[in-house]
Amino acid sequence: MKRILFFLLLGVCLGLKAADRDDSKYLAGAVPEVNGVVTFEKQFKVPGQTDDQIRNTLMTYVKESLVKNAIEGLRTRVISDGTTGEPICARIEEMMVFKNKPLYLDRTRFRSQTTISVENGKATITISQISYCTGEEAEGAKTETFKAEEWISDKASINKAGTKLYPRSAKYRRKTVDRVEQIFEEAMASFEPKAEKPVEKPKRRSVVVEE
C-alpha cells in the first residue's frame, strides 16, 4: 500500500513539475520551415576578414567540433570542405540525451545536415534534413526513425490553441532548438570567443548578427 501511495505521489509531483515548465521559447515559430522542410538558418558578418578566411575558420569548427564529437560512421562525414569556394556541407549523427541517470538512459540519435555558404563577408549557416532514430536502448525493441517535419514541426508538436507542446514530442523539439542555437553560437564564437553582443556594444564586436 505504501509503495502504491509513493508512486501516486511521484506521478502527481512530476505532473506539477511539467505544468510549471515555461515552454514559451519553444512554441509557434521556434522551428521554422522552408517549403515544408524544417530548416534553421543563421546569418552573420565578420568584418575585416576575407571570404576564404571566414570559410577556413568555419570549416575548422565543423571538423573539430561537429564531426569530431559526433558518432563515427557513414552518417557522419564532410561532403564538401569549401576549399574551392563552394558551400561547406557536412552530415552529422550525434547522441541527443534527454535523461541520464543510474539505471536509466533516455536518448536518441540526432541526424542533420549543416551547410555553410560565405559571400561578401557574410556567412549563412543552415541546418536541415533533421531526423531522429529511437528505440535502441530498449531491449528487444525495434528502432524507429522520425523526420523533423512529422515530429517537431508546429503542426505536429503544438496543440491547436498554440499554448502547449504535445508530451510525445516535446523533449525532441526543446532539445533540437537548444542544440541548433548552441551550434550557431559556437560557430560565431570561433571568430572571437569573448566578443560582446552587438546590441550592447556593436563597435567592439567583430561578428555582426543578422536575424
Give each language-model segment a name.
Residues 19-211:
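Ser/Thr-rich, low-complexity intrinsically disordered terminal regions
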